[in-house]
Amino acid sequence: MSDTPVIGVLALQGDVREHLVALAVADAVARPVRRPEELAEVDGLVLPGGESTTISKLAVLFGVMDPLRARVRDGMPVYGTCAGMIMLADKILDPRSGQETVGGIDMIVRRNAFGRQNESFEAAVDVEGVEGEPVEGVFIRAPWVESVGAAAEVLAEHDGHIVAVRQGNALATSFHPELTGDHRVHRLFADMVRANRAAQSL
């Protein structure tokens, strides 16, 4: 079995291309995923930024939501940025009508907590598990995590708010590392996928 993991990016809406580039730099085979049969062929999945309600509704429409929930429950590594973080939350504090989540991280998330698009900003974030300088994070109408359960590990905070969380094979950030050219968070995720593949092959 090749050591190179195949990592998908849910390609229904959002900044898909930037994630595909970041994953390729992180030595993964990166593929867009829109349908259940494409989901079945990947070792891990990125849920990109975008509009969480739209992504949720399209995931249901394309028949991806239920198989995605099942694979996350079964331990498939998954990484959500911004809207993707909201998708991985077990609970949203301020959900919009018809909004569903995949779940996977025992956390409560507040949508658009850092403000609207005109209040977007960049900030250096110390992320546990990422060596070297702080990660340059782009926050665009970003959520933050109000609280986490006992199983969830806080990896980073900004301005007193939780902005990066991991629970088992699920990773989530409020910010967009894929927009800065700093691919260390994607390397961290690719390493999670590799470790999971190795464990499954034993």
From Swiss-Prot:
GO terms for cellular component: cytosol; glutaminase complex. Its EC number is 4.3.3.6, 3.5.1.2. Pathway: Cofactor biosynthesis; pyridoxal 5'-phosphate biosynthesis. NCBIfam families: PLP_synth_Pdx2. The active site is at C82, H176, E178. The lineage of its organism: Bacteria, Bacillati, Actinomycetota, Actinomycetes, Kitasatosporales. Keywords: Glutamine amidotransferase, Hydrolase, Lyase, Pyridoxal phosphate. L-glutamine binds at G50, E51, S52, R111, I140, R141. InterPro entries: Class_I_gatase-like (IPR029062), PdxT/SNO (IPR002161), PdxT/SNO_CS (IPR021196). Catalyzes the hydrolysis of glutamine to glutamate and ammonia as part of the biosynthesis of pyridoxal 5'-phosphate. The resulting ammonia molecule is channeled to the active site of PdxS. One of its GO terms (molecular function) is glutaminase activity. In the presence of PdxS, forms a dodecamer of heterodimers. Only shows activity in the heterodimer. One of its GO terms (biological process) is glutamine catabolic process. Pfam families: SNO (PF01174). Belongs to the glutaminase PdxT/SNO family. The keyword Oxidoreductase does not apply. It catalyses: aldehydo-D-ribose 5-phosphate + D-glyceraldehyde 3-phosphate + L-glutamine = pyridoxal 5'-phosphate + L-glutamate + phosphate + 3 H2O + H(+); L-glutamine + H2O = L-glutamate + NH4(+). The keyword Hydrolase applies. This is Pyridoxal 5'-phosphate synthase subunit PdxT.
